[in-house]
From Swiss-Prot:
InterPro entries: NADH_UbQ_OxRdtase_su1/FPO, NADH_UbQ_OxRdtase_su1_CS
Lineage: Bacteria, Pseudomonadati, Campylobacterota, Epsilonproteobacteria, Campylobacterales
HAMAP family: NDH1_NuoH
Keywords for the protein's UniProt record, in alphabetical order: Cell inner membrane, Cell membrane, Membrane, NAD, Quinone, Translocase, Transmembrane, Transmembrane helix, Ubiquinone
EC number assigned by the record: 7.1.1.-
Oligomer status and interactors: NDH-1 is composed of 14 different subunits. Subunits NuoA, H, J, K, L, M, N constitute the membrane sector of the complex.
Protein name in UniProt: NADH-quinone oxidoreductase subunit H
Record localization: Cell inner membrane
Entry's Gene Ontology BP terms: aerobic respiration
One Pfam family linked to the record: NADHdh
GO molecular function terms listed in the Swiss-Prot or TrEMBL record: NADH dehydrogenase activity; oxidoreductase activity, acting on NAD(P)H, quinone or similar compound as acceptor; quinone binding
GO cellular component, one term: plasma membrane
Domain of life, per lineage: Bacteria
Reactions performed catalytically: a quinone + NADH + 5 H(+)(in) = a quinol + NAD(+) + 4 H(+)(out)
Length: 331
């Protein structure tokens, strides 16, 4: 097989595998969240459908596919229909620059478990993940529903504000590595736990994690779908599979940021003691994902004014201080 043919086949297989695996994990994420919340609230959670209730995911999928796809009478039809697609597709496109595993060989060809190893990986990731806000924005505006409009406005407010914190928190890491490639950042941390950026840049780790909660619409930092105030926010007027696509995008974003935090701050897929790198990245990402679920059960929502104060008066100045201190140390 020629190199060009192998490259084309490899790229197609990677795209299909990433799409199918992440979509499956997003479904499992809904099950995991329900079981974790149930455990923390001393409930059983899903248990009737399949062993330990694991087939509840299939039952929910059948329900979403068979429910009527309604639309408000005053909604903009075209924009209303494409908004969930934008939210879900942006979450999956952002994964194209993420190295999920260490490279390995097949039939003498080196396979790198990344769809596109561009030298601006972090910039691409932040740009595409930031585009997800358009799906939420136009979905709420096009639904002709007051809860949807308010939810979309609050979504834009929080996402645009914390996009700045998201980017600034990564600048010290980029300055120390000298590259925007996620693979280069992982290789910079291959000298044990002391080389992890969690140790070198702990403040940036906290800031980026806070911004990740905002990007994924996770409690306690979510203004988009606060049930006690906005019903379901921008998704109030949606039903069926289009409603489900918003949540597929949300859980896909959670998986993406769990992996990205593991790659940038927790050593990525570098092996640790006797644990191989492929298992290490899975364990680290699973811990971050569980942390996102745990905070929903443990912490209440912040008010919009509290969230904006956290962004502009606390996170932003701290991020700038980290940049200046890192620059001073490097120079």
């Amino acid at each position: 097989m020629s190199d060009i043919t192998f490259f084309i086949v490899e790229t197609i297989i990677k795209a299909v595998v990433i799409l199918s695996v992440i979509a499956t994990l997003a479904g499992l994420g809904t099950y995991a969240e329900r079981k974790v919340l149930a455990y923390m609230q001393r409930r059983v959670g899903p248990w009737m459908v399949g062993p330990a209730g694991v087939l509840q995911i299939v039952a929910d999928m059948i329900k979403l596919f068979t429910k009527e796809d309604t639309m408000p009478s005053g909604a903009n039809r075209f924009i209303f229909l494409i908004a969930p697609i934008i939210s879900a597709s942006c979450a999956f496109v952002a994964m194209s620059v993420i190295p999920f595993l260490p490279e390995f060989e097949i039939f003498g060809h080196v396979v790198r478990p990344i769809l596109s190893d561009v030298n601006i990986g972090i910039l691409f990731l932040l740009s595409v993940s930031g585009t997800c806000v358009y799906g939420t924005l136009i979905g709420g505006l096009a639904s002709y529903n007051k809860w949807g409009v308010i939810g979309s406005a609050r979504s834009v407010l929080q996402l645009i504000s914390f996009e700045i914190v998201n980017g600034l928190s990564l600048i010290p890491v980029i300055m120390m590595v000298g590259s925007l490639s996620l693979i280069d950042i992982v290789h910079e941390q291959n000298n044990g736990i002391t080389s992890w950026f969690l140790i070198k840049q702990p403040v940036c780790f906290v800031l980026f994690t806070i911004a990740a909660f905002i990007e994924c619409n996770r409690t306690p930092l979510c203004l988009t779908e606060n049930e006690t105030e906005l019903v379901a926010g921008c998704g109030t007027a949606y039903s069926g599979m289009r409603w489900g696509m918003f949540f597929i995008g949300e859980y896909a974003n959670m998986i993406t940021y769990s992996i990205v935090i593991s790659l940038i701050f927790l050593g990525g897929f570098n092996s640790f003691w006797f644990i191989p790198g492929s298992l290490m990245i899975f364990l680290k990402a699973s811990f971050i994902f569980f942390f996102m679920l745990w905070t929903r059960a443990a912490w209440p929502h912040l008010r919009p004014d509290q969230l904006m104060e956290l962004c502009w008066k606390i996170c932003m100045p701290i991020a700038l201080i980290c940049i200046f201190v890192t620059a001073f140390v490097i120079i």
